[in-house]
Swiss-Prot record:
Cofactor: Mg(2+)
A cellular-component GO term for this protein: I band
Xref: Pfam families: NIF (PF03031)
UniProt-recorded Gene Ontology molecular function terms: kinase binding; LIM domain binding; metal ion binding; phosphatase activity; protein-macromolecule adaptor activity; RNA polymerase II CTD heptapeptide repeat phosphatase activity
This protein's name: CTD small phosphatase-like protein 1
Disruption phenotype: Both RNAi-mediated knockdown of isoform a and of isoform b decreases egg laying triggered by serotonin treatment. Causes no visible defects in unc-89 and cpna-1 localization in body wall muscles.
Protein source organism: Caenorhabditis elegans
Length: 491
């Protein structure tokens, strides 16, 4: 037996299969209440439970008798989930052989099912009777109810995108679906689970619109050049620029490793910018192309002191010649130098080469000693302070004084302001004295060998060279310097 529920139920439910049970009529009720249930009168107490309050309807085909009330008695809708049913074949009556009435409720009257307090196992599900709703399966929600529209009460119109008619989805068969019921909590939970958010397409539209005018790669180049120009302007105006991470801390020190590789060397473009040239020409290339008499470059060293006027100039390297430094902790370091790089403080562990103190004390008596290193001053200057306690070095030159030539830092002795025939260089890297190999006293690279005696072994050679008026007198004429540039003195 079928009863009408309410106006809202008529929109939600469309068809139902009647349960097999005996119809309940007025003779089976006592005072408007089903036998065996709680006392809840459905009609005024002063009125009798007569057929005047009920209307009777019979179906000849199915043999079902229906009783319905016309009184303004309102009951809350049943909180019961309904299972979807299969659609009725075309050509048959839409609701159990009855054609639903097209009349709308008057004076706000609602027609609830009867009886209300009947157990759920006995009650018939409500159906709508106010409109001619065609029989169809119930709609199911798939993913997101926001993308779809509401059901058309008349059954017409285009189906929403997220509503699936029937048992499975058209887009994704594996997507879980729930019945479209405005009174069930599953629909609200499904709304909360919706996480699909559409991104705005304005950026794509602008990119598509202006792609021919300025491609994305060109935009990145322009932004990069603007950042570089702003950084250069800050340096020129004396304002601190934003610190940038130029690489690992190992670039602070120029070192020769055990495998022969050299770290701390910049790229060719960076070296040209450091040397003030953007065309790839180094200062040495300019010196080599110019005549000797037209060079007016300022010397790197100050004039000779009176006590050093009769001494030869001895240029000494620092890393792997006198000391070995590492950013990794070592056992029993001689010095630990704190160095700040990009706002972060790093610890540099320094080991002194064996007999370095005796070596510096000996050469300081006979030579004008100059410290020349390809490392940065923020690291090399504190190391020199701890290493040279007797102030043997008359001057200190760092990476800024080197010339970057063919991928290496070269120490150009012609820029010192000393006579080349009175200048010697001690270095473990042949690339450092590539411009003046005849002035070099090579030494082996030292890392951590405690039995090394290289510094003591070269002392006799230095004393022997100091006895000549010119270091080139040691060579035969065919082995001497072949270029006027090597004999040039800029003092």
């Amino acid at each position: 037996m079928t009863y009408a529920e309410s106006t809202r139920s008529a929109v939600v439910y469309s068809s139902i299969v009647p349960p097999p049970r005996t119809p309940v009529g007025p003779p089976m009720l006592k005072d408007g209440v089903r036998k065996g249930s709680a006392s809840q009168p459905l009609q005024p107490k002063n009125g009798a439970n007569s057929l005047d309050y009920w209307s009777k309807s019979e179906d000849e085909k199915s043999g079902i008798t229906c009783y319905y009330s016309r009184h303004n008695i309102q009951f809350p809708p049943p909180q019961r989930k309904m299972k979807p049913v299969k659609p009725n074949p075309v050509g048959r009556s839409t609701i159990n052989g009855f054609t639903p009435s097209t009349s709308s409720p008057q004076n706000g009257l609602r027609y609830p099912p009867f009886p209300q307090n009947t157990p759920e196992s006995v009650m018939s599900p409500p159906v709508g009777i106010y409109r001619n709703i065609p029989a169809m399966p119930r709609a199911k929600l798939t993913k997101d109810e926001k993308n779809g529209g509401k059901m058309n009460r008349d059954g017409g119109g285009e189906n929403p995108k997220n509503v699936v008619w029937g048992g499975t989805s058209r887009k994704d068969d594996d997507t879980a679906s729930t019945p479209l019921n405005s009174f069930s909590a599953n629909a609200s939970i499904e709304k909360k689970r919706s996480t699909a958010r559409r991104k705005p397409r304005w950026a794509r539209c602008f990119q598509t619109l202006f792609c021919c005018v300025t491609p994305p790669r060109e935009i990145e180049k322009i932004q990069s050049s603007q950042r570089t120009n702003s950084t250069n302007n800050n340096h020129q105006n004396g304002r601190p620029s934003t610190p940038t991470n130029t690489g690992p801390p190992i670039q602070l020190i120029t070192q020769v490793h055990r495998d022969g590789t050299v770290t701390g060397l910049p790229t060719t473009g960076q070296a040209c910018q450091q040397n003030g040239s953007g065309d790839g020409v180094t200062p040495y290339d300019k010196i080599a192309n110019d005549s000797v008499g037209t060079i007016n470059e300022k010397p790197l060293l100050p004039p000779l002191l009176p006590q050093d006027s009769n001494k030869k100039c001895l240029v000494i390297d620092l890393d792997e010649t006198l000391v070995h430094s590492s950013f990794k902790p070592v056992k029993n370091p001689d010095f630990v130098i704190p160095v700040e790089i990009d706002g972060v403080e790093h610890q540099v562990y320094v080991l002194k080469r064996p007999y370095v103190d005796e070596f510096l004390a000996k050469v300081g008596e006979h030579f004008e000693c100059i410290l020349f290193t390809a490392s940065l001053a923020k690291y090399a200057d504190p190391v020199a302070d701890l290493l040279d306690k007797k102030r043997v070095f008359r001057g200190r030159l760092f990476r800024e004084a080197c010339v970057f030539h063919k991928g290496n830092y070269v120490k150009d002795l012609s820029r010192l302001g000393r006579n080349l025939n009175q200048t010697l260089i001690i270095d473990n890297s042949p690339a450092s004295y590539a411009f003046h190999p005849e002035n070099a006293v090579p030494v082996t690279t030292w890392f951590d060998d405690p039995s090394d005696t290289e510094l003591l072994d070269i002392l006799p050679s230095l004393e022997h060279l100091n006895g000549f008026s010119s270091i080139y007198d040691l060579y035969r004429p065919e082995e001497g310097p072949q270029s006027e540039l090597l004999n040039h003195c800029s003092c």
